[in-house]
Amino acid sequence: MTPMKRSVQTQVSEPFMESWGEESLPELPAEQSLTEYSDLEEAPSAHTLYVGHLNPQFSVPVLACLLRDTLERLEMPVAREHIEVVRRPRKAYALVQVTVHRDTLASLPWRLQTALEEHLILKELAARGKDLLLSEAQGPFSHREEKEEEEEDSGLSPGPSPGSGVPLPTWPTHTLPDRPQAQQLQSCQGRPSGVCSDSAIVHQQIVGKDQLFQGAFLGSETRNMEFKRGSGEYLSLAFKHHVRRYVCAFLNSEGGSLLVGVEDSGLVQGIRCSHRDEDRARLLVDSILQGFKPQIFPDAYTLTFIPVISTSETSVPLKVIRLTVHTPKAQSQPQLYQTDQGEVFLRRDGSIQGPLSASAIQEWCRQRWLVELGKLEEKMKALMMEKEQLQQQLQQHGPVSCTCCVL
């Protein structure tokens, strides 16, 4: 009985399993299924990244420029139109549309850590005292931003809210130590300063140097500050004439600065200035100022080239040329400087007067001598008052009698 029952059960179960497998689990060709899955893994997909804790001190174009450069260093090139920056008084964040593999998103933490250690400009992108927050956005951001604002008001550190996005793998803040200054400057050691400066401009690594952001506001023109846009062939055509006019005018007044690459409204734009252009500008300024009379010494002026961080990529670095004339030292007699071409210029409020005629130069000398004469008269009055006070003190004490005794 037992063998018969076992055989019957086996005969019944086998057709049942065969029929169930055929109906519910249709077999697919192995090669086709593997190919489809491999294609899905290799094809990049579109994602929206949420970048938080941006520095609200920068403007929207500057934040977009720095964020674009940051993503390029992380091997995630993004077009400018795919970056949307939202800036508020106390915070700023961005939404970035990227098309990358899932593995690339997973490797963002260690690549961002490496970039932070090598590029100081990335640290300036984050708000003070905070680290950049990267997460994949999958939902609306209104609730997320409201929650982050509430947490900031309550003193809690903001983070990704549940359900609003799938955060990328995070890393502890103590794994990002501050890079020593000696290690930061190590890459620039052993090279000429000009070469180091140009390479720093190309890679947006400005170490130990001033820098300006395109679109920044520097203020308005004053008696001691003059702005020039410097577009086109400015360096080869108009720059030498402006050097003569403004340096001579600043020397004959209280000093000042000429900034080339800044609009009259005070907005920084920068001009295309390569390393060769820097050398030509230095030689031009030195050759012109050597012909001034009275003679000008090198410590009387300073010529610097300030890098400009731009939102657009250019083959030639953008810079602002700053020619500063220091306040002339007080002289025993008034001095009137003239250019290498024998012209004299004066600085008025917001304008340049000159070249002066002979009568204008005589009038200037007369006014200067009147000023010096007034100063001498004031000194004479002060000395006369001091003399009178000393005489009064002597008269109050009276004569002093002395008695001698001879033993």
Curated annotation (Swiss-Prot):
Keyword Acetylation (UniProt) = no
InterPro entries documented for this protein: Schlafen (IPR029684), Schlafen_AlbA_2_dom (IPR007421), Schlafen_AlbA_2_dom_sf (IPR038461)
Per UniProt, ATP binds at G261, V262, E263, D264, S265, G266, L267, V268
Q: Which residues form a coiled coil?
A: 366-398
Where does the record place Polar residues bias?
181-190
Reply yes or no: does the keyword ATP-binding apply. yes
Residue ranges annotated as transmembrane are none
Pfam families of this UniProt entry?
SLFN_AlbA_2
GO molecular function ontology, one term from the record: ATP binding
What keywords is this UniProt entry annotated with?
ATP-binding, Coiled coil, Nucleotide-binding
User: Which portions of the chain have biased composition (kind: Low complexity)?
Assistant: 155-167
Name the segments for region: Disordered: 1-28, 137-191
Q: Which family does it belong to?
A: Belongs to the Schlafen family. Subgroup I subfamily.
Protein name in the entry = Schlafen-like protein 1
Q: Which organism is it from?
A: Homo sapiens (Human)
